[in-house]
Every structure is written in structure tokens, then in C-alpha cells.
């Protein structure tokens, strides 16, 4: 059974953002603008995405 994944892309810079938000981007594996990672769709990942929703784009 395949697990559902999400494609998360960083759309804005982390410069000048709250330290916790910068750490959340790092936790998601995002390093720079337009960097895309595929992550499993879990409640923990969804919570991290919700925290930095204004800096990322999510595709199913």
C-alpha cells in the first residue's frame, strides 16, 4: 500500500522571519526558494506546513 505524499515548494525567503519558522522550513527539508521536497502526508508534516503556510506551496 503506497503512502500519500505531498510536494512542498518554498516560495518565499526565510530571511527576516521568526527563528521558529526558519527552523520549521529546515525541518521540512527546504533550503532555498523554489526548492521542492516530497514528504509523507502525516499530521506532523501538516502541522509544520500550517505554521509556515505563507512561505510554501503544497501540491497533492
From Swiss-Prot:
Q: Which NCBIfam families match?
A: rpmD_bact (TIGR01308)
Q: Which family does it belong to?
A: Belongs to the universal ribosomal protein uL30 family.
Q: Which SUPFAM superfamilies match?
A: Ribosomal protein L30p/L7e
- Please name the GO terms of the biological process aspect recorded for this protein, alphabetically: translation
- Native organism is Shewanella loihica (strain ATCC BAA-1088 / PV-4)
> Partners and quaternary state?
Part of the 50S ribosomal subunit.
The protein's matches in Gene3D superfamilies, at most eight in alphabetical order, are given as: Ribosomal protein L30, ferredoxin-like fold domain
Keywords on record = Ribonucleoprotein, Ribosomal protein
Picking any one GO molecular function of the record gives: structural constituent of ribosome
Q: What is this protein called?
A: Large ribosomal subunit protein uL30
- Cellular component, GO annotation: cytosolic large ribosomal subunit
Amino acid at each position: 500500500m503506497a503512502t500519500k505524499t505531498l510536494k512542498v515548494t518554498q516560495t518565499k525567503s526565510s530571511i527576516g522571519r521568526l527563528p521558529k519558522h526558519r527552523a520549521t522550513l529546515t525541518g521540512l527539508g527546504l533550503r532555498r526558494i523554489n526548492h521542492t521536497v516530497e514528504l509523507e502526508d502525516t499530521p506532523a508534516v501538516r502541522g509544520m506546513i500550517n505554521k509556515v503556510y505563507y512561505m510554501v506551496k503544497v501540491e497533492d
